[in-house]
Swiss-Prot record:
GO cellular component annotations of the record: cytoplasm
Task of the protein: Methylates ribosomal protein L11.
Enzyme class of the recorded protein, top EC level: transferase
GO biological process, one term: methylation
Protein name: Ribosomal protein L11 methyltransferase
Catalyzed reactions per annotation: L-lysyl-[protein] + 3 S-adenosyl-L-methionine = N(6),N(6),N(6)-trimethyl-L-lysyl-[protein] + 3 S-adenosyl-L-homocysteine + 3 H(+)
Alphabetic keyword roster: Cytoplasm, Methyltransferase, S-adenosyl-L-methionine, Transferase
Amino acid sequence: MKWSEVCVHTTQEAIEAVSNILHEAGASGVVIEDVEDFEMMSHREDNFGEIWDEKKRDEYPDSGVLVKAYLAESSDLTDTIKGIERDIQMLTKFGLTIGAGTVTLTQVDEEDWAHSWKQFYKPVKISRHLTVVPMWEEYTPQPDEKIIELDPGMAFGTGTHPTTVLCIQAIENYLQDNDRVVDVGTGSGVLAIAAAKLGAKDVFALDLDEVAVRSATDNVALNKVSQQVTVRQGDLMKELKEPVELIVANILAEVILLFVNDAYELTLPGGHFIASGIIGQKKEMVRDAMVAAGFTIVETTKLEDWVAIIAKREA
């Protein structure tokens, strides 16, 4: 079988939206190539992140990012590519900057694809105690290190996007043993898995997307946390009946605004709401909405162009 590599040249801001477009077109996973990752890792003072092969620096664009996906060649591939191009251009109507927004196509042999794509994925230390490891990698954790295994070939990626990293680090800082947690827009389920690994008693992982629900369910089983994590298909927080100690949402800023009042009502007094997926220039908009809902902002963290906002419902 022949495969085609679809490569989209876009911006950091549009990575998640472009990735979703590629998933909807039939891709089972995406590869993100961002030269700023090299720059960030070379200047970090902590030991978080992946070990990078500097020889690959010249393969990355000087500006913007490349989002790559692989589609099986078929008679309707031309129409599929036209649909991808159209949907990417439509993102500008939602206020996203897409940069070049170009789509290129390269043919790849199945044998080459079956082996070469795994080279992009290595263990990544996300926080003090959590490391994301591709399921095929042999990895021996340190005594205080917990492992999240993911299949990067599945939909919703690797769990190492800056917004995910910010969320996981905030969960590690604010989660208390035996807390109940809600993960809104769970995607791969990585935040729900992280909460379970860090001591949550019960975790409810919600997503409207059927593919996300399947992906999260598989990842929860892979990480052996099915007793703690319940994955449900649902519209934002409408499935919830009882308040919890911690709500997390790695989701677009505009979507956070839709349920921030519900988040306040479903956060126990003294509990926290962690919101990420927020591009820097939309930070104040989300902060203002959280405060208007009744939350107190306790911390804002930043990684690359993204921020996470941690808010508290006062006791």
